[in-house]
Amino acid sequence: MRLCIPQVLLALFLSMLTAPGEGSRRRATQARDTTQPALLRLSDHLLANYKKGVRPVRDWRKPTTVSIDVIMYAILNVDEKNQVLTTYIWYRQYWTDEFLQWTPEDFDNVTKLSIPTDSIWVPDILINEFVDVGKSPNIPYVYVHHRGEVQNYKPLQLVTACSLDIYNFPFDVQNCSLTFTSWLHTIQDINITLWRSPEEVRSDKSIFINQGEWELLEVFPQFKEFSIDISNSYAEMKFYVIIRRRPLFYAVSLLLPSIFLMVVDIVGFCLPPDSGERVSFKITLLLGYSVFLIIVSDTLPATAIGTPLIGVYFVVCMALLVISLAETIFIVRLVHKQDLQRPVPDWLRHLVLDRIAWILCLGEQPMAHRPPATFQANKTDDCSGSDLLPAMGNHCSHVGGPQDLEKTPRGRGSPLPPPREASLAVRGLLQELSSIRHFLEKRDEMREVARDWLRVGYVLDRLLFRIYLLAVLAYSITLVTLWSIWHYS
């Protein structure tokens, strides 16, 4: 007992000697803490023992909920050939980090702090449709609130795959999706929700640049839980970006020139079919339309899986021009046969000049009445045979007989030639007159045949013109109706 008392006294003495040193060190530490900025002290406090490789929850059974938001800023490019959409968006996301919480009163009432993104845990949320790295600005910081809420704001240039349907070009509406999902974590680890309500996301066009070729209709969000196998399920948030092309430029540069050329082709039917000007006019028009298609070929979207309807429209217009040229060649050939032309058959005369002319309200097309060819030939032969003179008074009274010769002044005032010489002279004269009459009748007959074929050609030309006009109008009305439905639906 006597030995313990000195030991106790020695311990008390030593504690009295060391107490002033420890107090001075504690006071020095407190002085140093108050001299440092609050943000620096808070950053050191939060990141001193932080492990960014671990999901920031105290209970591993609790999932980390990540709320995301997308605001469309601009449509930069729509590549129909490669099926790629380039957009510029404002992307926002926030989650709760349970390891980044503090009491604001301990740090000069600081409620939020910006810290480097590389220093903390960040969810691995990616876009499934990524096909290329966009030129997005780098934002290296995030905001952390005292309750552990982490806010990550950043603009993104997205180059994503999109199934583009160009059949309705230039009145097409495209629906492209942006699918945000965790590449590794299942829904038991990371769950995805919307930052704002779906109605606010759909109607938000506040920052969209609405001066380009494309018009933003809406951004429709949809949550979906999918699974690759039975045990693992993943959360994804899909944003459907619905855009519509402004068709005014393409209507002016593509549709109007084609419509003008087709109207000129229709007006070309006013040229008379018996002139050669219509054929050269149609050929020039067809050549001009071919040059027009070569010029606009680079403007049309080209894909390997489909052709726009406007491309079909151009091909059909080209086919109609070819049909119009073929019809013109047929009519010109029909009315220009002339000497080689046979008389119009009775069935064709009845069909075209009676029936079709009446249907087209062209009035009755008169046909020249010609006696049969056999009658004319027999009549000519009666006046040129060897028995001409004996029968002259009966069958050739239209030329004149010997009695008429006797009544002439020459016959009364001069002696008559011998009967033999008179008969030869009359025979030669009658043969010449018969040849002249035969030539004139043949010429008149050929002219009447040509006129008949010309009438047939005019009627067929009117018929084919109206059929062609109906085909052009029906095709144009169908396309305009379809494009109007697609544009205003």
UniProtKB/Swiss-Prot annotation:
Segments in the Extracellular topological domain: 24-246, 298-307, 487-489
Disulphide bond pairs: 162-176
Gene Ontology CC terms, in alphabetical order: cleavage furrow; postsynaptic membrane; serotonin-activated cation-selective channel complex
SUPFAM superfamilies listed in its UniProt record: Neurotransmitter-gated ion-channel transmembrane pore, Nicotinic receptor ligand binding domain-like
GO molecular function: identical protein binding; ligand-gated monoatomic ion channel activity involved in regulation of presynaptic membrane potential; serotonin binding; serotonin-gated monoatomic cation channel activity
Catalytic function, reaction form: Na(+)(in) = Na(+)(out); K(+)(in) = K(+)(out); Ca(2+)(in) = Ca(2+)(out); Mg(2+)(in) = Mg(2+)(out)
Record keyword Signal present: yes
InterPro entries xref list: 5HT3_rcpt, 5HT3_rcpt_A, LGIC_TM_5-HT3, Neur_chan_lig-bd, Neur_chan_lig-bd_sf, Neur_channel, Neuro-gated_channel_TM_sf, Neuro_actylchol_rec
Tissues where the protein occurs: Brain, spinal cord, and heart.
Keyword field contains Phosphoprotein: no
Membrane topology annotation: Multi-pass membrane protein
Glycan attachment positions: 109, 175, 191
Region described as HA-stretch: 425-461
Signal peptide annotation: 1-23
Sequence ranges on the Cytoplasmic membrane side: 274-278, 327-466
Location (main, coarse): membrane
TM helices/strands, residue ranges: 247-273, 279-297, 308-326, 467-486
Alphabetical GO biological process terms: inorganic cation transmembrane transport; serotonin receptor signaling pathway; serotonin-gated cation-selective signaling pathway
Family of the protein in this entry: Belongs to the ligand-gated ion channel (TC 1.A.9) family. 5-hydroxytryptamine receptor (TC 1.A.9.2) subfamily. HTR3A sub-subfamily.
Quaternary structure note: Forms homopentameric as well as heteropentameric serotonin-activated cation-selective channel complexes with HTR3B or HTR3C or HTR3D or HTR3E. The homomeric complex is functional but exhibits low conductance with modified voltage dependence, and decreased agonist and antagonist affinity. Heteropentameric complexes display properties which resemble that of neuronal serotonin-activated channels in vivo. Interacts with RIC3.
NCBIfam families in alphabetical order: LIC
The record's note on its domains: The HA-stretch region of HTR3A seems to be responsible for the low conductance of HTR3A homomers compared to that of HTR3A/HTR3B heteromers.
Protein purpose: Forms serotonin (5-hydroxytryptamine/5-HT3)-activated cation-selective channel complexes, which when activated cause fast, depolarizing responses in neurons.
Name listed for the protein in its UniProt record: 5-hydroxytryptamine receptor 3A
Originating species: Mus musculus (Mouse)
